[in-house]
């Protein structure tokens, strides 16, 4: 970890999931129980971070999202390396955790998963579109298999390339592979939650049309489960 004296600044800007500097993207989930505790937890995170200097040059950004289930928070941090995160965890993480837990007791932390960014898709020119909803698609496979992770994502991109009726509400999709070889996480940006719901209600299973390519994606050997969750971007923290 490199030393820094930069301040911590709050931002409303969404993160760049495809930033090539991000060598170690981490996702984690907290269960806090109610919309009020969601809001209080977000403010507790902001307070614990903003009162302290930015912890490391190797941390590019930290973002928090409120789940549409009215119970959970998603956390996404952009590290240049796992080693940089480990140094932060040893020396600077606990003081923040303690302050947050004092403000909002009984947070259930459901674990942190380490990923690597693999592929992103979407129009080269977003036309200034700002995401109104973040959709997280969490795919779990039966056991570790890096080749299967890559092949499945490639199959998704092939199905998208031949999609006969792409939904206009989708802005981008950013696929991440867990370092343990068992999961794929798609961080998808949509213009609104309603657009995503409309896409799910269209003919076909999921957001894709009823094509052979999408059926191959959905029946991939070793595919164990798929979970879809919607979030709002609630807090961005970056170095000043």
What function would you assign to each model-found segment?
Residues 1-76, 80-240:
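Short S/T/G/P-rich N-terminal loop/turn motif that feeds into the first structured element of a domain
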């Amino acid at each position: 970890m490199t030393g820094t004296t930069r301040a911590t600044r709050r931002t409303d800007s969404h993160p760049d999931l495809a930033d090539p500097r991000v060598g170690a993207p981490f996702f984690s989930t907290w269960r806090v129980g109610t919309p009020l505790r969601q809001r209080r937890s977000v403010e507790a995170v902001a307070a614990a971070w903003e009162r302290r200097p930015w912890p490391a040059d190797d941390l590019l950004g930290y973002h928090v999202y409120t789940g549409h289930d009215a119970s959970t928070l998603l956390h996404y941090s952009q590290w240049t390396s796992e080693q940089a995160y480990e140094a932060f965890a040893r020396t600077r993480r606990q003081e923040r955790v303690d302050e947050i837990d004092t403000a909002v007791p009984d947070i259930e932390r459901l674990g942190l998963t380490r990923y690597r960014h693999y592929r992103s898709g979407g129009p080269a020119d977003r036309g200034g579109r700002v995401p109104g909803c973040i959709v997280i698609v969490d795919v779990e496979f039966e056991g570790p298999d890096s080749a299967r992770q890559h092949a499945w994502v490639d199959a998704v991109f092939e199905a998208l390339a031949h999609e006969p009726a792409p939904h206009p509400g989708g802005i981008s999709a950013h696929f991440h592979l867990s370092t343990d070889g068992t999961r794929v996480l798609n961080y998808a940006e949509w213009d609104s939650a309603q657009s995503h719901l409309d896409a799910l209600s269209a003919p076909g299973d999921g957001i894709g049309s009823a094509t052979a390519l999408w059926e191959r994606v959905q029946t991939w050997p070793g595919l164990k489960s798929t979970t879809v969750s919607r979030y709002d971007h609630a807090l961005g923290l970056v170095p000043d």
